[in-house]
Amino acid sequence: MRRIVALVSGFGWHVEDLRRAAESLGIDFHPVEFSALRGYVGHLGKTVEASGVSLTEVDGVLGRMMPPAGLEPVVFRMDALHRVHRAGIPILNPPRSVEISVDKYLSLALIERAGLPVPPTFTGESSADALEAFEQLGGDTIVKPLFGSEGRGLVRVSDRETARRVFQALERIGSVLYVQKAIRHPGFDYRAFVLGGRVVASMKRHGPPADWRTNVAIGGRPEAVTLDPLLERMAVEAARAVEAEMAGVDLLDDLDTGRPVIIEVNAVPGWKALSKVTNVDIAKLVLEQLIGPQR
């Protein structure tokens, strides 16, 4: 029986959905917390283990959302995944793609380098520089944490005095300032789930009343949709730009330019709402992408 380990930050819906899919595929499924990772060097042939399972002896490793932690635990966890990957064990997503996509600045820069349209964005450490960029971006911006997802920590700033206070507060606590032009959109965005170089499911996310955000986690309403060829191509190319085999790609229709833009790419995407509205068994597809279809 094929065996995989899923590194998780809790045993919620996604873990149970993966367990169900694993049973249907005849896979021995081991979900373990990221904090259970153990690394060994020069230690009786051991390398990386989690809850007593050697990660260099399984058929695949699936990484889910990493829990918040300090710099040292995060670096160690990524080091351990790199070591497992270099041992030839399939990991979804590969560690480098996670490192790229979790960083909004780096991932957006690589997406732009791939020739894809992105929102004008400033990143820096100086509140004065950020305030200058605020004016250059039209005086209506979204301030985002450099790391983060699901619409959490986002602030829309549309007047100079508020911008100054927000930027100075972030500067005082040592945050990097990530300031993005607010895109005027029709009240919804698109989420494309890219797996193995193709879009396997997609949806529109309609924002809740009086909220410019569309994330389902904060009340957005999902609706199944078939993407047009342009949006589908953009989603696939954005995932490729950040080296992700699996990605949730967020796109917006820019009403001012008349063209869609890539907002961001998530290399650890959820699929609870997406699988519900599309009736696609995404968990099964994810496991098949990791270690191949049932044989």
Label each PLM-derived region with a short phrase:
Residues 114-138:
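Rossmann-like NAD(P)H-binding beta-loop-alpha module
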